[in-house]
């Protein structure tokens, strides 16, 4: 914590988020995870690609072929497979696409 003006939110999970919510529309950095549920694989790709920011996205699947297809189909800088947050290792770049602050 700090005594400087501003806002602080501890580690938080926002579940059942929809694209209409501001938590989805804004680019948030910190210990925050936003979870959207989609009907099918193509909807997941479409949702990621239609967003104005392209920093990172994650998908949970037990199908390696779908994981590879997802990686090559989404327009983001970082993709996580079966991890909550796509955090790069020290030898990978950290960056996004589109209007992402780090893009």
Language-model regions, residue ranges each:
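Conserved C-terminal structural/oligomerization subdomain of aldehyde/semialdehyde dehydrogenase
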Residues: 4, 8-103
């Amino acid at each position: 914590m700090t005594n400087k003006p501003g806002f602080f939110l501890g580690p938080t999970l926002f579940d059942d988020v929809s694209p209409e919510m501001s938590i989805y529309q804004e680019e948030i950095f910190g210990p925050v995870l936003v979870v959207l549920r989609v009907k099918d694989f193509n909807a997941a790709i479409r949702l990621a690609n239609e967003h104005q920011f392209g920093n990172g996205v994650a998908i949970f699947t037990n199908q390696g072929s779908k994981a590879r297809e997802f990686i090559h189909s989404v327009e983001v800088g970082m993709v996580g497979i079966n991890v909550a947050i796509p955090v790069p290792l020290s030898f990978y770049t950290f960056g996004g696409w589109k209007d992402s602050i780090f893009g």
